[in-house]
């Protein structure tokens, strides 16, 4: 399953430092994370994005400008299917940016989207009329009730400077537990940065905002 990263800072930072650490996490993951990657960053009041079908550890991380908000995703495609750059996250509608990892089978909701993650993003958007956290809670509850089997469903959605997270998994706690480190820089990642201190684990079934 995929790897997720969000970094939000009070001051602009060089994203290459975070992307290098994230690339190392993806490369060393016990599950292959090389089906492409992407990132989005805040530029003024708008989102800019980049996606590439190559593994993140083979790409150039120095191409991106300084920013105060970064969202990144390294993809491990479900059953090695639908490997195409347009299926790489982050997904964005210009207002929200979305990343996901997990595995769901027998989902009974109807929504537009090329792959399951995009359908989940569009389903959450359906309920977001200003209360993004409330929309995330409602959508996750419905999806859980309308899905035959969920191995994991970790979601991060960023809107303006708000970061909204939902985490749920039914096994493999070490792999699916999300982690965060708060301070002048907020960092949320699928794994703790190598040789870094001060991270906290996010409990399963958390839905919260920063």
Task: Set out the residue ranges of the language-model regions.
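Extreme N-terminus nucleophile/cap motif
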Residues: 1-54, 165-171, 186, 201-209
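A short, Trp-centered hydrophobic/proline-enriched beta-strand micro-motif
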Residues: 38, 70-73
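Short acidic (Asp/Glu) patches
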Residues: 50-62, 72-94
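Short histidine
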Residues: 105-163
């Amino acid at each position: 399953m995929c790897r997720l990263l969000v970094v939000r800072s009070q001051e602009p930072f060089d994203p290459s430092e975070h992307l290098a650490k994230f690339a190392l996490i993806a490369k060393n993951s016990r599950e292959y994370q090389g089906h492409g990657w992407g990132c989005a960053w805040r530029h003024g009041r708008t989102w800019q994005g980049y996606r590439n079908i190559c593994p993140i550890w083979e790409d150039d991380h120095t191409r991106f400008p300084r920013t105060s908000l970064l969202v990144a995703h390294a993809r491990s495609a479900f059953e090695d299917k639908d490997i195409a750059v347009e299926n790489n996250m982050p997904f964005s509608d210009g207002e929200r940016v979305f990343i996901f990892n997990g595995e769901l089978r027998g989902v009974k909701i109807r929504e537009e989207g090329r792959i399951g993650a995009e359908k989940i993003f569009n389903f959450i958007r359906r309920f977001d009329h200003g209360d993004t956290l409330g929309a995330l809670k409602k959508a996750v509850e419905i999806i859980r009730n309308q899905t035959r089997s969920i191995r994991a469903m970790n979601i991060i959605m960023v809107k303006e400077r708000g970061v909204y997270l939902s985490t749920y998994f039914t096994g493999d706690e070490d792999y699916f537990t999300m982690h965060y480190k708060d301070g002048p820089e907020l960092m949320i990642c699928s794994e703790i940065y190598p040789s870094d201190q001060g991270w906290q684990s996010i409990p399963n079934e958390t839905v919260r905002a920063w």
